[in-house]
């Protein structure tokens, strides 16, 4: 069990520049939403549009490919990707609630938070960080065991992470 968790102060949008794992609308397998591959080469500033950058949906099982043009308002609803509105792949029921994550790094952050004995807020005050907005049932130490079991269930059904950091930036040393 981690001793400490330090809030990295990111919002839910900070997880959108990485792979978002979704259910393919055609074959129901695991598909991936990423920043469109041509986006980085077409602009001098890759971070210019951030969460509003063009996206691509690809399913390696059935070869479905779709594009989202970007620059429009993102639809943000729980357990769906904000670009194509597809159900997230990384989700499961947990004590009458739905536990979900956009991708591996998001799931890692949730696990780090839940396992920590001590949870520290970030240096800046405010309530806009994703961690500060987690639901009460997920934050409760009483639900720790059940939430960790749900995270393990999600991981068992997840495809391997393409890039796994050596250590999580959310863990305090």
Regions found by a protein language model. Give the residues of each.
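Residue-level detector of secondary-structure boundary/capping sites
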Residues: 15-18, 50, 101, 125, ...
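Generic structural hydrophobic/aromatic packing signal, biased to beta-strands
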Residues: 22-27, 31, 59-62, 66, ...
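C-terminal, charged low-complexity interaction regions
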Residues: 133-173
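Extended interfacial segments that mediate partner engagement and assembly in macromolecular machines
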Residues: 69-136
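Amphipathic alpha-helical interaction surfaces
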Residues: 65-68, 116, 120, 144, ...
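N-terminal cysteine/histidine-rich coordination modules
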Residues: 1-73, 77
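Residues in flexible loops and secondary-structure boundaries
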Residues: 32-35, 39-41, 67, 107-109, ...
């Amino acid at each position: 069990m981690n001793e400490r968790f330090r809030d990295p102060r990111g919002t839910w949008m900070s997880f959108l520049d990485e792979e978002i794992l979704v259910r393919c609308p055609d074959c129901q397998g695991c598909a991936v939403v990423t920043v469109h591959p041509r986006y980085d080469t077409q602009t001098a500033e890759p971070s210019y549009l951030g969460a509003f950058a063009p996206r691509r949906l690809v399913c390696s099982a059935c070869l479905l490919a779709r594009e989202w043009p970007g620059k429009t308002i993102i639809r943000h609803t729980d357990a769906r990707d904000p670009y194509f509105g597809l159900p997230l792949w990384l989700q499961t029921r947990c004590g009458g609630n739905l536990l979900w994550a956009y991708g591996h790094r998001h799931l890692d952050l949730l696990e780090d938070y839940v396992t920590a004995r001590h949870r520290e807020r970030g240096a800046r005050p405010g309530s806009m960080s994703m961690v500060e907005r987690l639901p009460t049932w997920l934050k409760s130490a009483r639900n720790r065991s059940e939430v960790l079991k749900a995270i393990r269930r999600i991981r068992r059904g997840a495809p391997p992470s393409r890039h796994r950091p050596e250590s999580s930036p959310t863990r305090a040393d």
